Amino acid sequence: MEPLNASLLRTLEGFESIFRDNYTPLFRYVNSIINDEDLAKDVLSDLFLNLWQQKDKLQINELKPYLFRSAKNGALKALSSRYQTSELPDDAFNIAENTYNPFEKFVAKQSIKIVEDLINSLPLHRKEMIELRLLGLKNAEIAQVLDITEKKVEYNMREAIEQLSHAIHNSNLDKATIAGGLMLINIIFTVI
């Protein structure tokens, strides 16, 4: 089988294209695992160096899941059995500055903070799936990155939606914040 993007991997320009297209989401993902920007950069340097050095030997069927799986393995290796929780990427839920009036912006930021806190309270595997979804991966790609079945991803996403929705509904928050939080959850699981 001919490796996917084999022609891209054979030229420096193609490799640069792969690097440019994937570095930022990979950096966010690795940094969310290890919570250390310098170490995340080192992990990605090693990943791309290895990709370039092994370009003639690799048999990659789908590039994006391969890169995320390699990044995850590199991050876990860099942690060397040290467990550390992390926050979602700072820009996971960007709020455009000119989109909202001050009250709407306040409610949106409050809703985002609540949803982030709720996501961080999920079991680690569900949190990781949501982070990958926020980085733009589809269920099939998430399954490949985490080396699980797509059905397991779908099940855990449904369970995460139920957990998050239940937690928001049972909170002592005002209706606007609840509505904003539920809307964000819906966006995470449908649009992205």
Residue ranges and their predicted role:
Residues 72, 146-171:
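DNA-recognition helix of helix-turn-helix
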Residues 28, 42-49, 53, 61-73:
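Structural recognition of an alpha-helix C-terminal capping motif at a helix-to-coil junction
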Residues 6, 161-192:
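C-terminal edge and immediately downstream basic/flexible tail or linker adjoining helix-turn-helix-like DNA-binding
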Residues 69-88, 105-108:
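Arg/Lys-rich amphipathic alpha helix in sigma70-family domain 2
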Residues 1-25, 190-192:
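N-terminal module of bacterial RNA polymerase sigma factors
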Residues 93-117:
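Acidic, proline/glycine-rich intrinsically disordered inter-domain spacer in sigma factors
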Residues 129-130:
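A short pre-motif secondary-structure segment
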Residues 120, 124, 135-155:
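Helix-turn-helix DNA-binding module
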